[in-house]
């Protein structure tokens, strides 16, 4: 059986929480498409291509993980790819409220669409890409919250020498 799901997000930047969701997703599905959303209404720190490259490097050569990007509605991307399942990570009850609304809207737009929710690891309940960006911009240490390659990319992007 070839069970696949899409794990969409902005991943700006990829965090260890995202990696935990990818790992949990691989326990549920044969294949994951990590799909980087290109949202023109946001001003990302990293370009779509940079985010895709950082994700590829962080997941290594796992043949079960494909990294892609999309514009527009995720359900349209899911329809185009023929993958009507989405994997979403939850950290808190507040995440569920938003994700529940989104899942129902997606189901309305694409009736065969299914959302699968998994909890992130307890070490990452508080971690969000937005928070990581904010802490990094103000000079805080985000080591342990992001993969090593992302930490290096953040340091380069912000013009800071790597910590030793």
From Swiss-Prot:
<keyword id="KW-0067">ATP-binding</keyword>
<dbReference type="InterPro" id="IPR004821">
    <property type="entry name" value="Cyt_trans-like"/>
</dbReference>
<dbReference type="GO" id="GO:0005524">
    <property type="term" value="F:ATP binding"/>
</dbReference>
<feature type="site" description="Transition state stabilizer">
    <location>
        <position position="18"/>
    </location>
</feature>
<keyword id="KW-0547">Nucleotide-binding</keyword>
<keyword id="KW-0963">Cytoplasm</keyword>
<feature type="binding site">
    <location>
        <position position="18"/>
    </location>
    <ligand>
        <name>ATP</name>
    </ligand>
</feature>
<feature type="binding site">
    <location>
        <position position="10"/>
    </location>
    <ligand>
        <name>substrate</name>
    </ligand>
</feature>
<feature type="binding site">
    <location>
        <begin position="124"/>
        <end position="130"/>
    </location>
    <ligand>
        <name>ATP</name>
    </ligand>
</feature>
<feature type="binding site">
    <location>
        <position position="99"/>
    </location>
    <ligand>
        <name>ATP</name>
    </ligand>
</feature>
<feature type="binding site">
    <location>
        <position position="42"/>
    </location>
    <ligand>
        <name>substrate</name>
    </ligand>
</feature>
<dbReference type="GO" id="GO:0004595">
    <property type="term" value="F:pantetheine-phosphate adenylyltransferase activity"/>
</dbReference>
<comment type="pathway">
    <text>Cofactor biosynthesis; coenzyme A biosynthesis; CoA from (R)-pantothenate: step 4/5.</text>
</comment>
<feature type="binding site">
    <location>
        <position position="88"/>
    </location>
    <ligand>
        <name>substrate</name>
    </ligand>
</feature>
<dbReference type="GO" id="GO:0005737">
    <property type="term" value="C:cytoplasm"/>
</dbReference>
<keyword id="KW-0173">Coenzyme A biosynthesis</keyword>
<feature type="binding site">
    <location>
        <begin position="89"/>
        <end position="91"/>
    </location>
    <ligand>
        <name>ATP</name>
    </ligand>
</feature>
<protein>
    <recommendedName>
        <fullName>Phosphopantetheine adenylyltransferase</fullName>
        <ecNumber>2.7.7.3</ecNumber>
    </recommendedName>
</protein>
<comment type="similarity">
    <text>Belongs to the bacterial CoaD family.</text>
</comment>
<keyword id="KW-0548">Nucleotidyltransferase</keyword>
<comment type="function">
    <text>Reversibly transfers an adenylyl group from ATP to 4'-phosphopantetheine, yielding dephospho-CoA (dPCoA) and pyrophosphate.</text>
</comment>
<dbReference type="GO" id="GO:0015937">
    <property type="term" value="P:coenzyme A biosynthetic process"/>
</dbReference>
<feature type="binding site">
    <location>
        <begin position="10"/>
        <end position="11"/>
    </location>
    <ligand>
        <name>ATP</name>
    </ligand>
</feature>
<feature type="binding site">
    <location>
        <position position="74"/>
    </location>
    <ligand>
        <name>substrate</name>
    </ligand>
</feature>
<dbReference type="InterPro" id="IPR001980">
    <property type="entry name" value="PPAT"/>
</dbReference>
<keyword id="KW-0808">Transferase</keyword>
<dbReference type="Pfam" id="PF01467">
    <property type="entry name" value="CTP_transf_like"/>
</dbReference>
<dbReference type="InterPro" id="IPR014729">
    <property type="entry name" value="Rossmann-like_a/b/a_fold"/>
</dbReference>
<keyword id="KW-0460">Magnesium</keyword>
<comment type="subunit">
    <text>Homohexamer.</text>
</comment>
């Amino acid at each position: 059986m070839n069970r696949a799901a899409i794990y969409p997000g902005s991943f700006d930047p990829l965090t260890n929480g995202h990696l935990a969701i990818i790992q949990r997703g691989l326990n549920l599905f044969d294949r994951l498409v990590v799909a980087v959303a290109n949202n023109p209404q946001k001003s990302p720190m990293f370009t779509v291509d940079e985010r895709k490259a950082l994700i590829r490097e962080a997941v290594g050569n796992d043949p079960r993980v494909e990294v892609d990007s999309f514009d527009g509605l995720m359900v349209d991307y899911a329809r185009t790819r023929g993958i009507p399942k989405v994997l979403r990570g939850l950290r808190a009850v507040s995440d569920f409220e938003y994700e529940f609304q989104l899942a129902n809207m997606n189901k309305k737009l694409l009736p065969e669409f299914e959302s699968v929710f998994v909890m992130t690891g307890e070490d990452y309940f508080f971690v969000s890409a937005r928070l990581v960006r904010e802490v990094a911009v103000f000079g805080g240490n985000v080591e342990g919250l992001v993969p090593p390659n992302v930490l290096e990319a953040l340091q380069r992007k912000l013009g800071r020498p790597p910590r030793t």
